[in-house]
Amino acid sequence: MEKRRVGQTKLEIDSLGLGGAPLGGNFVDLGYAQAEELIQTAKNIGIGYFDTAPWYGFGRSERVMGDVLRGSEYILSDKVGRLLAPGPVKNPADFGMVDPLPFNVVYDYSYDGIMRAYEDNLQRLGLDRI
């Protein structure tokens, strides 16, 4: 797999990665087993870069990504600025989501909000690094 350097860093990532929006039910209801199979297939063909976000199914994508990636080598990107607060999603279709987890988004781009989002992301992923 061709690699590309990230900015001025020494980090190199695959030129092709797997995006996690469909894994969270964004625009299509991809069940857990299908999502797990998709991630595993990507790993098996040499993809090592994965991307997810709290927005993707309000945590659904992060949960399955963490479960499948745990214990393997990977590069994972996630997002901050949107915290998830427990509560029913009133109109998931308005967000382009099918069967999201029961959370609502709270926008917070402050330093504390970003750090909280990072910690929350790790918790949903069940991982110790992003």
What are these regions (language model features)?
Residues F27, D94-I130:
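Glycine/proline-rich, positively charged
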Residues M1-P86:
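N-terminal binding-site loop/beta-alpha segment at the start of enzyme catalytic domains
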Residues G46, W55-E62, P88-D94, R116-R124:
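Noncatalytic linker/hinge segments flanking ATPase motor cores
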Residues G71, I75-Y111:
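Structural motif corresponding to the early beta-alpha repeats
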